[in-house]
Structures are given as structure tokens and as C-alpha cells.
Amino acid sequence: MGIFEEAKKYIVGGVNSPVRAFKSVGGEPPFIEKGEGAYIYDINGNKYLDYIQSWGPLIFGHCDKDIEKAICNAVSKGVSFGAPTTVEVELAKEVLDLFPHLDLIRFVNSGTEATMSAIRVARGVSGKDDIIKFEGCYHGHSDSLLVSAGSGAATFGTPSSPGVPADFTKHTLLAKYNDIESVKKCFENGNVGCVIIEPIAGNMSLVPAEKEFLTELRELCTKNGAILIFDEVMSGFRAGLRGSYDVYGIEADIVTFGKVIGGGMPVGAFAGKKVIMEQLSPEGPIYQAGTLSGNPVAMSAGLAMLKKLKSNPELYKDLESKAKKLMKGFEEISKENGIDIQTNVVGSMFGFFFNSKKPKNFDDVNESDTKRYAKFHSEMLKRGFYFAPSAYETGFICTVMNDTDIDATLNAYKEIAPSL
């Protein structure tokens, strides 16, 4: 019996997060034993160049010595206290120092907790129940955000998972990404308390918002008294040191973070303006809590990560250069082989679509050739290149990847392209 079959005997589906099961690309997932730099190694000794990097957090690659040292030092003092620690204060100061429009922060344990809590605060402060989210944007698996599109952009959301009561999602309105008119329709009922969006969508591969769209969205929220939430769990510290703020310069009322902010440990956070955040308990009436929130080991990893990023701001140009080289190579090889492909790069994030037109929203993304992606994934994995096991996920570059790694990836794609 293989390890995956054995895992299925004890763990639901053999995995603890569905995408890891390789259902959308076929085959069995490699079980990873260790990571080092830009590479991961499975239990059979196979080596893979890792373009997932734990879905984004590992911007310095696996087993970075500075982060490893910070974690070991923290563990030696105790793994959890359930009490305040100075490292929480240090990390909070480092984060808020980057964002002049954010005054206070609250640490949690995951991106899902961050977005769920941000929406609770926004509803509590605005006094309105309805929220607007966008098709194709994923904000974690909390009930009110697990919705799919109805018959139109302004319809009430319908649950996209059994176990989510319709009453939970009836206050979730769906709009189309990069389509401001669909947002205006959602505002017509007068009961919208907040809007949540990935300003750089990383859960329909990579689709950045158009600046004009985000600018108008900011104006609409201000005009209608709705709180604007930027979900930067993925793009935070990845699109740039200050995430989407470096790309667009647009100020959200609340920003959620995750992934990079924890240095690879389970951490989430949400930060906002004082007038909003001071409504959280224990200062205000809106309740939010967590036994392991602000865990000293996770905070130490995040602090080491952020200090290293802030001391090397030039690294983002290098990361983006590598990502652009990879995507340009994919475009050239695809063209040589008559393959339709579209690519996007923002900072150290990249995405590509087997599609004849550049996707602007989820409808466009759904026109991509997912069967071709599945074959691409399988063939590249055989050759030692670990891309996301889903056409709807973003890829990531880390600092320890070099031109030789990129060239090897392009050579492998050149080899398989004629058969795709």
C-alpha cells in the first residue's frame, strides 16, 4: 500500500487541504520530506524546483537560516503562553510602520480568521449586514464567504458548500471583478456594510485589478458609508513590500494579512483605522479572540521575515525580473508550438492561462483550457518542477531561485510543449 492510500485510511481524502489531493490535475501527490532553498524533496528522494513555496509564505525559500534561528530561539523559551509577549508588539510596529493609513492590528491564526473577523468588525461598525464579494476571489472558508455566483452580479449569493445555510449567505452579494457597474447594482439596496476584495486576485490564477476599477470602488465605498477591505493574505509583502499599496497606492479601511507575515508559520492578521479597530474587544463591543493568537514562535518567525524584507527592499525588483523571465519564456515557447497562453506578473507572483484572451474576471478565467494545464502539470512534475496542482492557483518566485533554475524550467517546458 502506498503512502497516499494509507493516508486515506486515517485522514479525509488523505490530505488536510483539498487542493493537495491533485484531484484537478490527476495522479498522486508526492509526500514531502524536506525543503531546502528553492527545492523540496519527497519521501522517495525525488527533487523538485518549488514554484508553490507553501502557497506563498516562503519568499526566502525553504529553511532560511535567519528565520530558522528565530524560530529555534523562540521555542527554547516556550512554545505558547496564552499571555502578551513583547514580540507581538515588535511585529505589530514593523507592520504598521509600512502602512501610514493603518493604525491598529490584531493577530490571528490564519487568513480565514483574518477575513472572517474583518467582516464582523466592518458589519459591527457600519451597522449594515450585507457584504459585497467578487466572483473568483477566495477569502477563506468561513460560511458567509463560501458563495458562488447566482443568476446575475447583483443577486444574493447561494451556498457553494453543503453545510452552509442559505440564511448565512443571503447577505452576501456577488459582483464581477473589474466591473464597477456590477458593484453599483449591489449598492442599490442601501444595506451594504462592507466590500471585500483581493486587489490582486490570486485564487483564479493571477488577475490584478485595474487601477481605475479600484479607484472607483474606493469612491463608491466612501460615498455609501461602506468599509473597504483589501484581502492581502496572498499579495501582502509578495506584490511588493507594502503589497498592493505599492502597486496602486489605494488605501483600504481594513487590510487582512497572512502567509508571509508568519514566516511560514500559521499566522493571520487584520489591521485598520483606529476608529474601526477600537471597536474590537476588549476596547469595544465587537468580540474576537483566539487561544493561540500572537503565538510567540509564529510571531518570531514573522518578525525575522519582515525585518529581512525591510532591510533588502531591492529584492522585489529581482524577484519580479525572474518571474517576468519565466513568463516571457512560456509565452515564446507557447507561440512556437501554437499554444494559446496569457500571463501575468505582479512582484514575485505569477500566473498563466491556456487561453486566447487575457482574463479580467472569473468568467474569462473559466474559459481557460484546464485539461491542457493538467497535462502541463503532470509532465513538469515528472521532470522535477512543482507547480500548483490547480489551474486556479498562483505561482511564486523565491529569492534563492536563480537564472539557472528559470532556464531549466523553460527547457523542460520546451520539451513538453509539442505534446500539450
Swiss-Prot record:
EC number: 5.4.3.8
GO cellular component term, pick one: cytoplasm
Subunit structure as annotated in this protein's UniProt entry: Homodimer.
Species assigned in the record: Nautilia profundicola (strain ATCC BAA-1463 / DSM 18972 / AmH)
This protein's name: Glutamate-1-semialdehyde 2,1-aminomutase
Cited PANTHER family: GLUTAMATE-1-SEMIALDEHYDE 2,1-AMINOMUTASE (PTHR43713), GLUTAMATE-1-SEMIALDEHYDE 2,1-AMINOMUTASE 1, CHLOROPLASTIC-RELATED (PTHR43713:SF3)
Pathway(s) the chain acts in: Porphyrin-containing compound metabolism; protoporphyrin-IX biosynthesis; 5-aminolevulinate from L-glutamyl-tRNA(Glu): step 2/2
Record-linked Pfam families: Aminotran_3
Encoding gene, per UniProt annotation: hemL
This protein's record includes keyword Zinc: no
Family, as annotated: Belongs to the class-III pyridoxal-phosphate-dependent aminotransferase family. HemL subfamily.
Compartment(s) where it occurs, according to its Swiss-Prot or TrEMBL record: Cytoplasm
Keywords associated with the record: Cytoplasm, Isomerase, Porphyrin biosynthesis, Pyridoxal phosphate
Reaction(s) this enzyme catalyzes, per UniProt: (S)-4-amino-5-oxopentanoate = 5-aminolevulinate
One GO term of the biological process aspect: protoporphyrinogen IX biosynthetic process
Listed GO MF terms: glutamate-1-semialdehyde 2,1-aminomutase activity; pyridoxal phosphate binding; transaminase activity
Highest rank taxon of the organism: Bacteria
Primary location class: cytoplasm
InterPro entries to which the protein is assigned, alphabetical: 4pyrrol_synth_GluAld_NH2Trfase (IPR004639), Aminotrans_3 (IPR005814), Aminotrans_3_PPA_site (IPR049704), PyrdxlP-dep_Trfase (IPR015424), PyrdxlP-dep_Trfase_major (IPR015421), PyrdxlP-dep_Trfase_small (IPR015422)
Phylogenetic placement of the source organism: Bacteria, Pseudomonadati, Campylobacterota, Epsilonproteobacteria, Nautiliales
Enzyme class per UniProt: isomerase
Cofactor(s) for this UniProt protein: pyridoxal 5'-phosphate
Residues with PTM N6-(pyridoxal phosphate)lysine: K259
